[in-house]
Amino acid sequence: MKRKLNENNEPVLVSGTNKKKSDTEVSSAVANATPSSEAASSSSFADLGLDPRLLQAVAQQSFQKPTLVQSKAIPLALEGRDVLAKAKTGSGKTAAYVLPILQAVLKRKQINPGATYISSLILVPTRELTVQVTKEVERFSAFCAKEVQVVGLTDKVSDAVQRSLLQSSSPDIVVSTPSTAWRNVDSGALSLDKLTHLVLDEADLVLSYGYDEDLEKVARGLPKGVQTVMTSATLTDEIDTLKGIFLRDPVLLDLEEPDAEGSEITQYIVKCGEDEKFLLAYILFKLQLIKGKVIIFVADVDRCYRLKLFFEQFGIRSCILNSELPVNSRISVVEEFNRNVYDIIIASDENEMMGDEDRPAPNGDGKEEAEVDKKHENEDEGQDGEASKAAPRPKKKRKMDRKRDKQYGVSRGIDFKNVAVVVNFDLPLSSTSYTHRIGRTGRAGQAGMVLSFYVPKELFRKHIPTSIDSAENDEKVLARVIKQQKKLGREIKPYNFDRDQVESFRYRMNDALRAVTKIAVREARTRELRQELLKSEKLKRHFEENPAELQHLVRHDGELRTARANPELRHVPDYLLPKEGRKGLSAAEIGFVPLRKSSDRQKKGRFFKKGGARSFKAGGRKPDPLKTFKAKRKTK
């Protein structure tokens, strides 16, 4: 079935094709009067017809009622329909496909308890998302753990180890990236002969991460009649391609639920120079003007370490998340951040930015699409491609790209819990990336704040040591971001502060930046990678011995100490603080101060006068050793 996108960026049938039935589209209002649509209006999980053990697990997760995507998708999936669900980040898409899969496994085990085979395959774009989805399946199957077995293929282990894991545990559900899944299918470790359910989570990212060949090979190995569920935050050309490969007469859920998430997010922008980014970051975190858990997004790996070393100068602890770190270390960082071990994560978003950079602009320049685009998260995609192409990566950094993990992603899919603030230290290259970044905060009705730094054209390249190429397009990207957020009914406000007060801290910022040299950054990358490789081996052994818990904590926010240390920068003197924030002590708080020296100081003075410390005055006369020498006669 051939399809194309209409002016609303929605898949439609190509004129002239003869098909019995087009895709069934269900928007926020129920479109067709099927039995499933009536069930979709359920106000509780009990109305969805789930197993009591699953309902008990749902209650344990403190889920009060199903979200819009859950109430629409779960009944359709239980009926055996193929589903393509488009809903915003944080709307509960994972539970929307996990619960029907578990229901099908439990139903099959009741009919044939002895049948053990892989019946469900969940494909995700990143290793971090593999771990997250595996844990979600384990949580929802907590009260039926004996009947349901799940395996997540995440660790960078040999094929032989993965084969033994799949054969020994006899899982019902496998979670993996497409490349890892196909490698095991090709080796015979993963059998798809009896597969009944297939899930493509974050489907719009799967192709952009370069899994097209792996997906085609997996599709050729699927048996007939496999039920497929695809979830995505956006509807793009990639989705249309995947739909033609995997789905048969799917139900399209294009859901726009009440914007509770976005309404809780307060967005601010700051116009600043390239070096002023570091100045503002120092003030915000050292003076604790930002409180709570924070994710700081930067453009690349070098910026990660430069900002971390800069923070170290002032005693600000932070940990790093980028594609060069071992997968076990990345998983550990996310897990411990969610358990409140760390408060600040500096995350590089280079994979998503590279994806936008490499994506060709549709319709040439993309102007026509910008005029008729009504999909908020895909707005001006062609212009985003132009902006990203205008800022190519330096050739020196291309060598470093080879070490990066293509299966790394941080701004999409990963469930960071209780994030209070998202700081766009470097503005992304597209409005779509901005939308996904701010989706890390303000989740589940909680309040959140987004603070974005942007460099105007007149300040670009004014401070070479801290300059990056992508900052040249900050104004263009910001204009599209503001336009996109305005369509969503959100406002981006300027972040107001007293610039005179900020300038008084500049000399301290300059001292810290001078210490963070290119050599220090390069040594920090090498040292951090070496340390994390050792930690990763410890974590891998611990995961093998204790798969259900992670009590062995390995700190990831230690100091790298490759930059020259300035201990005096760790303390902020009172005279730099505004009058309202000074620690001025009253006379009552100071206490009694005697006029004369205390007795212990007097004793110390007498001791030095007598020559107890054998200290001589500068320029004074040295004692004659013949006169001062004393010796006692030896007694027999």
Swiss-Prot record:
Residues reported to bind ATP: 87-94
UniProt-listed CDD domains: DEADc_DDX56 (cd17961), SF2_C_DEAD (cd18787)
Motif (DEAD box): 201-204
Biased composition range(s): Basic residues: 392-401, 603-612
Keywords, sorted A to Z: ATP-binding, Helicase, Hydrolase, Nucleotide-binding, Nucleus, Ribosome biogenesis, RNA-binding, rRNA processing
Gene Ontology terms describing biological process: maturation of LSU-rRNA from tricistronic rRNA transcript (SSU-rRNA, 5.8S rRNA, LSU-rRNA)
Motif (Q motif): 43-71
The reaction(s) this protein catalyses: ATP + H2O = ADP + phosphate + H(+)
Leader sequence residues: none
Entry EC number(s): 3.6.4.13
Feature: compositional bias, Low complexity: 31-44
Family of the protein in this entry: Belongs to the DEAD box helicase family. DDX56/DBP9 subfamily.
Protein name in UniProt: ATP-dependent RNA helicase DBP9
Source organism (scientific name): Pyricularia oryzae (strain 70-15 / ATCC MYA-4617 / FGSC 8958)
Gene symbol of the encoding locus: DBP9
